[in-house]
Design a protein with these regions (language model features):
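Walker A/P-loop phosphate-binding motif and the immediately C-terminal alpha-helix
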Residues: 5-39, 173
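Short glycine/serine/threonine-rich phosphate/pyrophosphate-binding segments
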Residues: 18-23, 45-46, 122-130, 153-155
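Phosphate-binding/switch loop-helix module in NTP-utilizing enzymes
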Residues: 83-133
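Conserved Switch II/interswitch segment of TRAFAC-class P-loop GTPases
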Residues: 113-126, 138-159
Length: 230
């Protein structure tokens, strides 16, 4: 197993489009790269829902006397999430050590195979998940998702500082769900952290209608190329 690049997609607040943009990054690159998504949001996993894999349980395989989960596959994207492992109507009410253990299981007990890019859909906020991910994975860089809301901006600044303290590189941030009534955020809003792109409000994103035309219009493949080669 080899993973060439590991990219964390993060947000300080829930509901800003982080998981959707993670999926759209993966879909925009899946034609030319071997892509995986690690859904690190143990308490609120969404990737299996975004890819319509709600009712599918991961297959277990034995390799060298060890059990591994086969990642679910959709659109040539490998997806590992606690969502299909737990029943959808059951919440994971776990303390920090159990959360860290679940993340380690997803990382090390998933039969990823060879990947060009692994996107990590981070949980909102900061805390144990960030510490575990930073220790267990060699993250090449992170991308933050924020809206123009002052609350989102304030919390994003805190999460950026958390990544800096954990020595997680930061590629930049994406401003999501802008409309003609909102001013576009200043490129220097977070100091030396650049703005990678702005995404206008699009109903298709909220209804999870990830059509080829939507994927093409967002040009997230070009965004990836720009920040990965900077």
């Amino acid at each position: 197993m080899s993973i060439k690049k590991i990219i964390a997609i993060a947000s300080a607040k829930g509901g800003v489009g982080k998981s959707s943009i993670t999926s759209l990054f993966a879909l925009s690159l899946a034609k030319n790269f071997n892509i995986g998504i690690l859904d690190a949001d143990i308490y609120g996993p969404n990737q299996h829902i975004l890819f319509n894999l709600n009712s599918i349980k991961p297959e277990i395989v034995i390799k060298q006397s060890k059990k591994f989960f086969k990642p679910l596959i959709k659109n040539n994207i490998k997806i590992a999430s606690m969502g299909p492992i737990l029943d959808d109507d059951k919440a994971a009410i776990w303390r920090g050590p159990m959360l860290s253990s679940a993340l380690q299981q997803l990382i090390y007990s998933t039969d990823w195979g060879d990947l060009d890019i692994l996107f990590v859909d981070m949980p909102p906020g900061t805390g144990d998940a960030y510490i575990t991910i930073s220790k267990e994975l060699n993250i090449d860089g992170s991308v933050f998702i924020t809206t123009a809301s002052p609350l989102s901006i304030n919390d994003t600044a805190k999460s950026i500082n958390t990544c800096k303290k954990l020595n997680i590189p930061i590629f930049g941030y994406i401003e999501n769900s802008i409309n003609e009534l909102e001013s576009i955020l200043d490129s220097n809003l977070f100091g030396d952290i650049p703005k990678l792109t702005s995404i206008k409000f699009n109903k298709k994103i909220y209804t999870m209608d990830f059509s080829d035309s939507l994927i093409s219009s967002l040009k997230l493949d070009k965004v990836y190329e720009n920040f990965i080669n900077t």
